[in-house]
Amino acid sequence: MRHSKSGRKLNRTASHRKAMFANMAISLIEHEQIVTTLPKAKEIRPIVEKLVTLGKRGGLHARRQAIAALRDAGKVAKLFDTLAPRYASRNGGYLRIMKAGFRTGDNAPMAVIEFVDRDVDAKGAVDRARAESAANEKEASSL
């Protein structure tokens, strides 16, 4: 019987789920909005909300716990320095899930998960910077 079993398996092994959720959390912290399937969005929300709470707590131990979960010190720095102060006055509910229709191909329910009061410029900022630097290098090499 399945009584009192929490969480979804998502047709993956435990190690695959753990790695996938860590990667999704990193992407969500970096871009502040991602598009994924609805079950994955529902599973990632409590993970990232606990990480934001760790960021609000501050301190060395909380930072080390976040690094252990995310495996990316740069994103942990953003979590503690940018996101935690932004949500200092909010007690939970840092993320929102919006349904986004169905995926073409397999008709899977899709969702957009994003931070409440997110920075709109954060989405795609890394890609824009990468494209801009590539264009600058191309100009410099052509001169």
UniProtKB/Swiss-Prot annotation:
Alphabetically ordered keywords of this record:
Ribonucleoprotein, Ribosomal protein
* Cross-referenced Pfam families: Ribosomal_L17
Task: Give the domain of life.
Answer: Bacteria
Gene Ontology terms: biological process: translation
Under the GO molecular function aspect, what terms does this record hold?
A: structural constituent of ribosome
Which InterPro entries does the protein's record reference? Ribosomal_bL17 (IPR000456), Ribosomal_bL17_CS (IPR047859), Ribosomal_bL17_sf (IPR036373)
Q: Which residues form the signal peptide?
A: none
A cellular-component GO term for this protein: cytosolic large ribosomal subunit
The cross-references to HAMAP family, in alphabetical order and at most eight, read: Ribosomal_bL17
The entry describes its oligomerization and partners as: Part of the 50S ribosomal subunit. Contacts protein L32.
According to its UniProt record, which protein family does this protein belong to? Belongs to the bacterial ribosomal protein bL17 family.
Q: What is the recorded name of this protein?
A: Large ribosomal subunit protein bL17
What is the scientific name of the source organism?
Answer: Bartonella quintana (strain Toulouse) (Rochalimaea quintana)
Q: Which taxonomic lineage is given here?
A: Bacteria, Pseudomonadati, Pseudomonadota, Alphaproteobacteria, Hyphomicrobiales
